[in-house]
Every structure is written in structure tokens, then in C-alpha cells.
């Protein structure tokens, strides 16, 4: 079951990053500017962020498995249509619909893991799912780049039809049903509980870290890519992608978070992850050596991979019975951070250079390190 949840999380979230290597291809194919072509990614991201909050709340009412399966089935229908469009407006519209469909999965799978696995295994399972989320940022780009080099951009989406169909079958037949709350009240009743997350002491503080982690992660990818493409290194976009791929090594630590949390506690593991990420980010720009940069990028991604599962576990523990809503808001804040990351990084690069950008992002991680000290943990809620 863990392998299925890992696989489905990877292929769903990879769709967020598919169009990053395709921007110039879309610009040429549809005769639009690169900034307009970037809307193929932005439309997905905005729909994914908003939809995650909406559907995560509904999973409380209708069940986690139903929401995961519905999302995958809709992806199976919508995704191949994207490959067949001849209008850029339709491309953007269908990518937005794809984002809404994909947004049904992440908050549901995280809430499912928290409910269906015993406490001792919970952080480990969340670690595997978090690893899939993090790896998706690289795997999605590598996949679409490989397909475009060998076929055409349309096949990026045609092939995913089969991937999502197989994933739907796996969820339908090999994943047991989760818990479903009794549907009391109207359809909109669950949404009235969103305000409850701000009444739980510590949850709003957790969301500061949620945003900061992904401002740093996406800012890291943006700044590192520009840095390696500069005259100092002169790497091609394909070479840069492989440098980023090395970061997967650091992400592989996430499944071991459960053992670390059991031994040291969730807050200590979270702080340790933030320290690792801050050190890796802070040292990145100090020495313009490719091997050193790659090494520090692994340190950085190791820190993120340690911090993210611990943070999700902490949110679930504080939230208790409203964990689905709490995790949905976490995903919303994650994508707010992911949207702000490139904007902040480009601004900092233009006004202060690469070293300055790395240090500011490291500073954000260091500031977020203070936050866990203001979070008090009570006995775990059911």
C-alpha cells in the first residue's frame, strides 16, 4: 500500500512541473511570448492551490479514497485532451482543469495516511509521500524534457493518460476504504470549519514554516538554475536539470523521518531539518565550484526532506479531528510559497546578485527555526 501511495503521489504532483521545460516550445508552437507561455504552468498552480483547500475539506465528508480516485479519473480524462489542443487559450484552460483535478489528491492522501496507519508508522508513511512530492519537482521536468527530445510535446500528455489510468486502477482495487464522517448539515457545512484551524494553538505558526520551506525550495531551484546558466559556469538547460537531479539523493532521507521522530521527537527533527537546509543554502554561493555547489544542494534538499514530513506530522498532531482541513491549508500555504519563491528570487538576483539571494533565503530558513519554540505539544489527539 505504501508503494502505491508513493507512486500515485509522485505522478500526480509531477504534473505541476511538466511545463517548466516546455515554455519556449509553447511560445514557438502557439506564437506567444515566453511570459504568456508561462501561464501553462501558472494556471495549473493557481487551480491546484485553491482546489486543494476546497477538496481537502470535502474529503472529510465524502472520504479520502473517493477523492483520490475521483482526482485520478478526472486526470485520466483531461490530460490527453491537453495534448490535442491547437489553441493556446484551450491549453491554459485545460491546464487549469488539470490543476483542479490534481488538487484532489495531495490533501486526501496525507489525511488518509494519518488515519489509516498507526502512530509508530505514520511519520514514516508521510515521509514516503513527502519524498514523492519533493521528487516530483525534478522528475516532472526530467520526464517532459526526455519526451520532447524524442517525440513532441503532445506525447508528454498522451503518455500520462496511461499512467493515470493505471494509477486509478491501483487506488480502486488495492487501497482499502478510509474513514468517512457522517454528512451532517449542508454541503457547505465542512467549509465553516476552516476557521477552526486558527483556533488551534500552534497551527498558524506551522503554516509560516509551510510557506517558508517552499519559498526556499523553489527559490533555490530558480536561483541555482540562473547561477549555473550564467557566464561563471555556462551550463546548458539540460546540464542544469541533471545537476538538480542530484538533489534527489538528499530527498531519500524523508522515509527515515519516522525513526528519527520516534527517537528524538517531532520538533527536534523539524529544527534539525531547518538547520541543514539553512546551512546548505547559506554556503551555496560562497565558492563558485560545481562540485561544492552540488554537495551543498544535497545538504539543502536533505534538510527540506527532514523538515517536511516532520512538519506535516506536527500539523496532524495539533489538528486532531480536523486534520484534513489543516493539511489542506498546509498545501495551500505550500503553493503560496512556491508561487512567491521565483518572484522573490528574481527580484533579489536583480538587486543584489546570486550570493545575496542565497543568503536571504538562508536567513528566512533561520528565522523559521525560531517558530517551533513557540509551539507547545499536548497529548496526541485521536
Each PLM stretch: what is its role?
Residues 90, 119, 128-175:
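Helix-loop-helix hairpin linking two adjacent transmembrane segments in secondary transporters
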Residues 31, 63, 84-90, 118, ...:
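Helix-breaking motifs and short loop linkers at transmembrane-helix boundaries and internal kinks
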Residues 176-207:
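Juxtamembrane intracellular "pre-TM" segments in multi-pass secondary transporters
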